[in-house]
């Protein structure tokens, strides 16, 4: 969107939402709206139903783990006190507007936000995916269960503290004639590239 359209949309959001919005920022030609988790259900309805907004389509929803998000590893970005966020990407077909909405879960140990399925039914599988991969609970979701990992999977693989090798591995046991689980046998290791610091290395002597 052009700068003038972004500025108008930001002004409309501030006017319509008032104190219910925490922050509106613009980067790379997109607006990001930050709201409290307690206000999410009401704000979602306003974003969809208000004639000046009309965000009738939820394009995508994802979870984010900010536990290792700091100025030490991500220059120019502020670390958040709250660990988990849910990010929604919305589209207004009528006005041809796009909006990113970010909501932080208040509890780092048991992250929970309200489901937006009553407003955007397409959130169904998106919320199940965020639940499966990040362990974020979506209140009032009618069928909140894993969608990508196996039924007996332990943990949430997109959390920063989840081991890269996982906890268990599965294989086919010819004796039992079925797939079995066993503790992972891969040993974690750090691979450091070998750097040769000789300035003339590899040059043939003339």
Swiss-Prot record:
It is a peripheral membrane protein. Transmembrane segments: none annotated. GO terms for molecular function: NADH dehydrogenase (ubiquinone) activity; NADH:ubiquinone reductase (non-electrogenic) activity; quinone binding. GO terms for cellular component: plasma membrane. Its EC number is 7.1.1.-. Its main location: membrane. It holds the Pfam family Complex1_30kDa. It comes from the Bacteria. Keywords: Cell inner membrane, Cell membrane, Membrane, NAD, Quinone, Translocase, Transport, Ubiquinone. It catalyses: a quinone + NADH + 5 H(+)(in) = a quinol + NAD(+) + 4 H(+)(out). It is found in: Cell inner membrane. NCBIfam families: NuoC_fam, PRK06074.1-1. NDH-1 shuttles electrons from NADH, via FMN and iron-sulfur (Fe-S) centers, to quinones in the respiratory chain. The immediate electron acceptor for the enzyme in this species is believed to be ubiquinone. Couples the redox reaction to proton translocation (for every two electrons transferred, four hydrogen ions are translocated across the cytoplasmic membrane), and thus conserves the redox energy in a proton gradient. NDH-1 is composed of 14 different subunits. Subunits NuoB, C, D, E, F, and G constitute the peripheral sector of the complex. Belongs to the complex I 30 kDa subunit family. This is NADH-quinone oxidoreductase subunit C.
